[in-house]
């Protein structure tokens, strides 16, 4: 559905040259929700705007539905953009128009026949849950309701792709959840492909199928959301995930325990089974759970536990090997009183 290849965007001023997007490549499959995470200045917005060519890449290609947008003329690009909706952090509603009027305006601007507009507006109002607000003005709406109007306008031309530029960052946590639930519903019911950018890993955890981390214009890590949460590689990815799922124990706390310290990761249904207790009993190893929980990512359980193991060294090694055989990952943080380098 979306394929970016070696995208680079350079901003030039009289005094300097700034690389906003640095040789980025990624793919988003049809019907996927793809989240791009990064701090301010990481290049997220620049990259998102390259997808529909609001920002024209300095080099590289971007294909949407098989079309290389970088090679289209002005008229062809305008037509292609009709199938790419976009919502923003700020709502950009017309204050003098009602909710109905704001959505109708988007349809009129797209060239939809006047006699077809009312029915389409009603359809969109129903879709985003604002049928009872059709005659309200923006000043009478909450932030979440304003964003729903923005989503309705973005869907006016029945796009196959929706780009979300920090769409929930101005909303409170409860409203954010409701907007994310709406986006998930649109993805499932309409088969809508969604690319969203955010600095909140919780947003990605809530609704995304795949994700990427951006830093200094580069995409430093990407993959299935579940896999990235289970085994983050880049330090920045670990930092972001730590904001949502914290499994870090301070060194001064660990120093109070003399046994082998291990982190055990269970994926899928294995996370819900009593493998650890069964194993410890089988190998006569004593276990002390220091920290842990089972998180649900995309409906799939991910269990991460940090524990102290005490017993004969050979028995501990055998227990760890057995746990690994039972579809778990084990990282020995410290072997007895000797810290691993």
Curated annotation (Swiss-Prot):
Q: What family does this belong to? A: Belongs to the ABC transporter superfamily. Methionine importer (TC 3.A.1.24) family.
> Which of UniProt's keywords are assigned here?
Amino-acid transport, ATP-binding, Cell membrane, Membrane, Nucleotide-binding, Translocase, Transport
Gene3D superfamilies per UniProt: 3.30.70.260, P-loop containing nucleotide triphosphate hydrolases (3.40.50.300)
Top-level taxon in the UniProt lineage: Bacteria
What GO cellular component is one of the record's annotations? plasma membrane
- Coiled coil (UniProt feature): none
Function field: Part of the ABC transporter complex MetNIQ involved in methionine import. Responsible for energy coupling to the transport system.
Q: Where in the cell is it found?
A: Cell membrane
* EC number(s) given by UniProt: 7.4.2.11
The keyword Chaperone belongs to this UniProt entry's keyword annotation: no
Q: Report a single Gene Ontology molecular function.
A: ATP hydrolysis activity
User: Nucleotide-binding: is it a keyword of this entry?
Assistant: yes
> How would you summarize the oligomeric state and partners of this protein?
The complex is composed of two ATP-binding proteins (MetN), two transmembrane proteins (MetI) and a solute-binding protein (MetQ).
Topology with regard to the membrane?
Answer: Peripheral membrane protein
List ligand-binding residues for ATP.
Answer: 38-45
Protein name per the record? Methionine import ATP-binding protein MetN 2
| PROSITE patterns in UniProt | ABC_TRANSPORTER_1, ABC_TRANSPORTER_2, METN
Catalysis performed (reactions): L-methionine(out) + ATP + H2O = L-methionine(in) + ADP + phosphate + H(+); D-methionine(out) + ATP + H2O = D-methionine(in) + ADP + phosphate + H(+)
Name the source organism: Shouchella clausii (strain KSM-K16)
The chain positions of domain ABC transporter read 2-241
């Amino acid at each position: 559905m979306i394929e970016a290849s070696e995208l680079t965007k350079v901003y030039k001023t009289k005094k300097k040259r700034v690389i906003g997007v640095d040789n980025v490549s990624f793919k988003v499959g049809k019907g996927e929700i793809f989240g791009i995470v990064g701090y301010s200045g990481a290049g997220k917005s620049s990259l998102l705007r390259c997808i529909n060519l609001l920002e024209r890449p300095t080099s590289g290609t971007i294909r949407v539905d098989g079309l290389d947008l970088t090679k289209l003329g002005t008229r062809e690009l305008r037509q292609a953009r009709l199938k790419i909706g976009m919502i923003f952090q700020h709502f950009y509603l017309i204050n003098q128009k009602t909710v109905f009027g704001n959505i109708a305006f988007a349809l009129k601007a797209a060239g939809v026949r006047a006699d077809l507009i009312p029915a389409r507006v009603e359809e969109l109002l129903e879709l985003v849950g604002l049928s009872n607000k059709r005659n309200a003005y923006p000043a009478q709406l909450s932030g979440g309701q304003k964003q729903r109007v923005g989503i309705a306008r973005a869907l006016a031309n029945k796009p196959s792709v929706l780009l979300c530029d920090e769409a929930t960052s101005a909303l409170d946590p409860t409203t954010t959840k409701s907007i994310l639930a709406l986006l998930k519903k649109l993805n499932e019911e309409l088969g809508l492909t969604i690319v969203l950018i955010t600095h909140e890993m919780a947003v990605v955890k809530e609704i995304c199928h795949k994700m990427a981390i951006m830093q200094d214009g580069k995409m430093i890590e990407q993959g299935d959301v579940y896999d990235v949460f289970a085994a983050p590689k880049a330090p920045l990815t670990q930092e972001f995930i730590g904001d949502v799922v914290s499994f870090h124990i301070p060194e001064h706390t660990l120093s109070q325990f003399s046994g082998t310290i291990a982190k055990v990761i269970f994926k899928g249904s294995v996370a819900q089974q009593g493998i650890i207790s069964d194993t410890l009993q089988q190998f006569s190893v004593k276990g002390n759970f220091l920290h842990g929980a089972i998180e649900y990512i995309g409906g799939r359980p991910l269990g991460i536990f940090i524990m102290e193991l005490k017993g004969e060294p050979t028995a501990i090694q055998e227990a760890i090997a057995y746990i690994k055989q039972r579809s778990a990952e084990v990282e020995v943080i410290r072997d007895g009183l000797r810290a691993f380098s």
